[in-house]
Each structure stands twice: as C-alpha cells, then as structure tokens.
C-alpha cells in the first residue's frame, strides 16, 4: 500500500486541509452533478484540479518559472511530464460516487462497513504480509491516513499476533505524494527493498513492524531490518484530536444533499445532456483550455510559432552575475512566497470554518460515531498450539530457535530471514517446511514463544533429544548469528539460554 489512504478522516489539525473539503463542498452531491454533466461519466480533470489547488505557488508560478529559467535543458522533460500528467481519465458515475461516498466521506472501509458481493470487507481478513509506505511530505495521503486504520481495526498488537498477521510500515521523511510513485530515488531504494523483502516477511513472527532502511557498506546495497512496534508508535504520528464525530456529521449532511439533488435536480439535468454536450463541457475545463489555448489549435498562436524559431536560433544565455537575473529571481521568489501565504490563509480559513460548523457539542450529540463492525475472531492463534509446546522434532526445534533469536532484541534483520530461508531449502529435514508450511511453522512457534517463552526454550531439549541434532540446530543458528560482537545483548542472552536448555555449546 504505497501512498494509499485507508483512514480517510485522519490527519493533523493545521497541516492536512484536504480532508475538510468534503464538508465545505456539501459532500458527494457534486460528484453526482459532474457525472450527470458528463453524460454518466466523471471527468478526471476535476480530481487533478483539486490536487493542483493544494500548492498554488507551484501550480501558478514556480513550475512555469523553472521551465523558462532553464529553457535550454527543461523543454523535453517538461513536455513529457505534462503529457503524462494531463492524460485525464474518466470514471463512471457509479464508480466515483462509491469512492467518495463509501471511502472519503463515509470512511466505511476501516470500520468494516463496505459491502461487496453480498458481504462486508473486513481488513482483518487480509492474509499474507501487509506493507504500508507513507511519507511525512505527502499532503494527499498523510501518514495518519495511511496508518491509523491499524489501531482502529486491530486495537492492540496482541490482536495482530493472535490472528497471525504481519503488518510492516515505513514512513519517508519528505517525499511528496507524486514522488512516492514516480521518484527515481524512491524507486531505487524504498520500492526495491520492499519488493526484495516480500519473500522474507512471512518468516517474521506475527506482529507490527517498522521497516528501517540504512545505507550498507557496499555501493547500492542497503541494510534492512524490521523493528517491532506498538500501536502507540502509530498514534504518536497523530495529534490526539478526536474529530470523528465532525466527519460523521459531514457524512450525514452529504447523504442529505445527495438525496435532495437526485430527487429534485437530477431529473432536470439528465434530459438535456447528450454525449456531444458532455464532450464540449469536458473540453472547456480550465486544465484543458490552459493547455490547448497556447497550442497550434489556437490560430492566434501562429505568429508566436515563427517568433519561437527565431528566438531559439538567436538564444544567448545571460550570465549568472547579470543584475537583472538577480532581480528576476528575487521577484520570482517573492511571488512564490505570496502565493504560499495566500494558500496558508485559505487553508486556515477553511479549517476554521469546518470546525466552527461541524465541531460543536450540538452536532456531537446527534452524530456520535458507531462502533466499528470490523473485527472477526477467525484464524486466531490456535489454543491447541500451546499444547504442542513439547511436540515435534528437528524441524520444529530449529524453527523455534530461529524465531526466538530473530525477535529477541525487538529488531529483525532481513539478512537473517533470508539466510534461514536459504538453509531451509538445503537441509533435508527442513526442506519439507518450504513455502506455505514454513510460514505456518513460524506462526506456530512464534505463538508458543509469545505465550510461554521460558517453557518454550526449556522444551527444546524434548524436541531435540539427540546430541547430534542439538549440535546441528545450534550450528544452523550460529551460521546466521555468528558474530558475537555484533549481536544485541538480548540476542546473546537468548542464545545462551538456548545453549543451557540443550546442555551444549559450540
């Protein structure tokens, strides 16, 4: 889940104004109106306009100024990006209505109230490791919207463990929403390491982890580890302001406005809209007219085409010491700062308006949040597994040892998981646990260790009664956790406890 919101109401006051827009626009009725004006299709240019409106200085000034200030090198990149960025898509009216009403305004997904194919979607039922990638610099999907569903759905990390789920998240410090998907450095680092970690993630004990990427000792190689986290680590990213009832009031207002529109306004709009008129309305969208208005489609631009060729052939770049260039940069910076100030005032005004209208005790009384419906208890950590604490053989003993050591210090290095998977493919007694059975074995042994860690370690002597098996199991552990100087104190202590339980050391 890269830059994907699942907690649509979450955010920090004074920092994430986009979440308030559903309130001051009246809700989903505008999507219904735009879909009707599009003859049943919603124009994606409306979504892009909302995105560009978030950063006035970049949209109205900085992007264009940077192009002209670097006209000798930026032309090709600028045109390539603009062609991609302005390739607007269309959604059916039903699609956009579902997305806005059920998700962005209703926030029903994390509550388990989104119905599909006759049943509600419960995020607890997502099997396999879940990777979440968020960024502090993302003003479209802030970390709170990407991560707050975890404590909402699971309540505690123990709930995650009981249902044998692995959730891994990573928070970038600065990259923006678009950069999460198209940035080259992010693709070469975060995306590559997440993809490389998929095969090792199912060897982690069930729980919540933060993925940490550190620069490695070799070029283009990173050291990846998984730090155990608690729900408080996710809540720490938020501002502890409970404004859920305000958004519940917005959802109620949205439903009322949409019902009014569909009943009293739609019957007068749909009969007069046909495909030709809808196409004309789409072409008149400001994001389109601002592009083809300065293209060859506009006959008034023909003289500029000839002038452009003349200017290109007689181009003389000004020196950096040119006083007019220095003045130009100062004026440009001042324009950008002014637009940023206008944006801040606008966002603050919208937030204050939202809070004054929707965040008051009267609405709190009428629009109390209902408890989440999510939270089935199926696939919980099986109680009978605890009864198997002394059952098993060499394979179970090795998996228990590896799980105990890998998670002893609260941090698990990806290289350790990768090394154990490679060993499990080579050892004839472990090869039977490859793939799905290996993940199940890790879940079982992690459950046993979490429930009774001291008993689980002591029972290793029963699982490995033969001295040769004990030496072989410890040799596997030592091949992965080899350097005593680099081992965390908790890992050393756990390894010594295992050696004492087996009455053997290497």
How does the language model describe each region?
Residues 2-94, 222-318:
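Alpha/beta-hydrolase-fold enzymes
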Residues 158-252, 257, 334, 348-370:
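Catalytic active-site module of serine/aspartate enzymes centered on a nucleophile-bearing elbow/loop
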Residues 265-396:
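Extended non-globular C-terminal regions
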């Amino acid at each position: 889940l890269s830059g994907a919101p699942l907690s649509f109401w979450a955010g920090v006051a004074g920092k994430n104004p986009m979440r308030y827009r559903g309130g001051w626009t009246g809700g989903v009725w505008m999507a219904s109106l735009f879909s009707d004006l599009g003859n049943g299709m919603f124009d994606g240019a409306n979504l892009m306009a909302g995105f560009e409106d978030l950063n006035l200085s970049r949209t109205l000034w900085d992007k264009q100024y940077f192009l002209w200030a670097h006209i000798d090198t930026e032309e090709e990149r600028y045109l390539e990006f603009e062609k991609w960025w302005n390739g607007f898509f269309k959604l059916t009216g039903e699609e956009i209505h579902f997305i806005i009403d059920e998700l962005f305004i209703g926030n029903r997904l994390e509550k388990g109230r989104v119905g599909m194919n006759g049943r509600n979607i419960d995020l607890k039922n997502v099997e396999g490791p879940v990777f979440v990638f968020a960024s502090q610099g993302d003003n479209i999907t802030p970390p709170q919207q990407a991560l707050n569903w975890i404590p909402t759905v699971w309540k505690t990390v123990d709930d995650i463990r009981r249902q044998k789920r692995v959730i891994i998240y990573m928070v970038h410090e600065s990259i923006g929403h678009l950069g999460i998907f198209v940035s080259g450095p992010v693709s070469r680092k975060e995306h590559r390491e997440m993809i490389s970690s998929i095969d090792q993630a199912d060897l982690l004990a069930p729980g919540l982890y933060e993925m940490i990427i550190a620069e490695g000792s070799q070029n283009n190689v990173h050291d990846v580890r998984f730090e155990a986290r608690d729900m408080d680590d996710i809540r720490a990213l938020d501002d502890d302001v409970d404004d859920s009832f305000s958004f519940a009031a917005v959802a109620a207002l949205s439903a009322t406005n949409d019902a009014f529109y569909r009943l009293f306004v739609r019957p007068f709009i749909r009969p007069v809209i046909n495909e030709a008129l809808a196409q004309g309305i789409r072409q008149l969208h400001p994001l389109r007219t601002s592009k083809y208005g300065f293209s060859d489609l506009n006959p008034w631009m023909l003289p500029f085409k000839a002038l452009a060729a003349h200017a290109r052939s007689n181009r003389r770049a000004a020196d950096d010491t040119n006083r007019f260039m220095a003045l130009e940069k100062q004026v440009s910076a001042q324009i950008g700062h002014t637009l940023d100030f206008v944006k801040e005032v606008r966002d603050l005004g919208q937030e204050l308006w939202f809070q004054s209208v929707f965040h008051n005790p009267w609405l709190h009384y009428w629009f109390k949040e209902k408890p989440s419906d999510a939270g089935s208890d199926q696939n919980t950590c099986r109680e009978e597994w605890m009864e198997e604490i002394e059952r098993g053989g060499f394979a179970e003993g090795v998996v228990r040892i590896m799980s105990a050591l890998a998670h002893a210090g609260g941090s698990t290095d990806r290289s350790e998981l990768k090394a154990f998977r490679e060993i499990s493919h080579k050892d004839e007694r472990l090869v039977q646990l490859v793939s799905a059975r290996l993940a199940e074995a890790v879940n079982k042994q992690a459950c046993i260790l979490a429930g009774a860690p001291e008993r689980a370690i002591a029972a290793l002597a029963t699982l490995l009664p033969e001295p040769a098996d004990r030496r072989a199991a410890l040799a596997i552990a030592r091949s992965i956790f080899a350097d005593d100087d680099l081992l965390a104190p908790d890992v050393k202590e756990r390894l010594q406890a295992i050696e004492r339980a087996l009455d053997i050391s290497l």
